[in-house]
Every structure is written in C-alpha cells, then in structure tokens.
Amino acid sequence: MSYNLTDPYEIARYIKEAKKSTPIKAYIEGDLSNCDFTNIEKFNSGDLYILFGESEEILVIIENNKDKIKNCRIEQDRRKSAIPLLDMLKVNARIEPGAIIRDKVLIGENAVIMMGAVINIGAEIGEGTMVDMNAVVGARGKLGKNVHLGAGAVVAGVLEPPSSDPCTIEDNVLIGANAVILEGIKIGKGSVVAAGSIVTTDVPENVVVAGAPAKIIKEVDVKTKDKTKLLDDLRK
C-alpha cells in the first residue's frame, strides 16, 4: 500500500496502519537447545544466548523454559512503535549519539545532527546544516543548506494540528536557541531568528527577527553576518 507522505492525513494513516513493533534484546543463560527460534535472531555459545526479536515471541520462549533458565536480562527501548528509525549507515553526515531520527527523513551531505536532536518523519535537512542539541524538526519540516538550528529550537511539524504546508527554513538561516517556528511558517534566505523568539508569520530574506511574537528589528548587516557565521570545520 502506498501513502502520500506530503499530506498530514496520509502520514497519520500510514502510522495508524503500520504494524506496531516492540523489539527486545534478551541475554539468557540456560538450556534452550530445543526451542523454536523462527522469526528470532539468535546468537549463542553453549548455554549463553542473545536473542533479538518481537517481545511476544521471545517472552513465550522465556516463560516456557523458565525452569531451564539460570539468568535472564531484557533490554527494550520502545513499545508498539509504528515507524522505524533511519538507517544512518546510508547517510553521509555527522550524527552524534542520542539523536533520534525516524525513517523517511532526508539528510544532506555533511550535515551535523547533535546529541538529543529529534527529527520526525518526512523532514528534510539540507547540505551542511546543523541541528543542534535537543532541537526538534517536526514532520515534513524542511531545512535548507547551511542552516543552523540552535539548541532546543523547534521547527513545528504538520501532523498535530494537521497542516498542509510544512515549515520551510531556506538556505543560510540561523535560528537561535529555544526559538519556536510555528506550523507552516517560511523563513527567507539569510535571515536570523533571535534566541527564544516565537515566529508566527513568514519572515522575508536577510532580516533579523526577535520577540514573542517575533518582529523584524533590522536587516542583516556586516556585523550580523560576522556574529552569526558558521564554522566549516564542524561540518567535516
């Protein structure tokens, strides 16, 4: 079944209809030699087993063989998850530990995703763009090239409340820490959003906005460019 992931209602349908998954990892010491490991990934040496699979299948094995098991430890990081995480091995970018990136996200060359960043389904991160610590890019949020999304900043998604227009952050924009860009807003090329701002209307190119709600306070000048320049070394 195909889905139009540019439509918030289609994304919601995709999530609703997706098979929910509760994968676990089990470390087991015991005699499981007579068990059926169909649909379970098994590694073992003697009586030591590491099992990867869905919780209901592994837990059945543990329950049915509890008298043969000496020790058992289970690791779990999600429950009834609808969307898998992105396969980061296919991305030519720097992604630090603790970043959470869902599947069907596009990440450009030499982008940087810092610790604790969250990027939702359908988002696009441009070449050379940095998503700083604990920043959030909601569903279908679009960040252009060489954008800096500051720590704790939020680019709202299209899912809830549903919105047909995603947030669009154009090239060379700097968004300060803890700023919030509301649903459907467009930030023009080269503009700067001050830390803590709440942006409720579109922002034209090459201006500085600040406040809650954010308002234009000046045009980007040489001094502003010097204070907001990016470091290429962080993207190599």
Curated annotation (Swiss-Prot):
Matching SUPFAM superfamilies: Trimeric LpxA-like enzymes
GO BP annotations listed: diaminopimelate biosynthetic process; lysine biosynthetic process via diaminopimelate
Highest taxon, organism lineage: Bacteria
The keyword Signal appears for this protein: no
The reaction(s) this protein catalyses: (S)-2,3,4,5-tetrahydrodipicolinate + acetyl-CoA + H2O = L-2-acetamido-6-oxoheptanedioate + CoA
Membrane-spanning segments: none
Family of the protein in this entry: Belongs to the transferase hexapeptide repeat family. DapH subfamily.
HAMAP family: DapH
Name of the protein in its database record: 2,3,4,5-tetrahydropyridine-2,6-dicarboxylate N-acetyltransferase
Organism field: Clostridium botulinum (strain Langeland / NCTC 10281 / Type F)
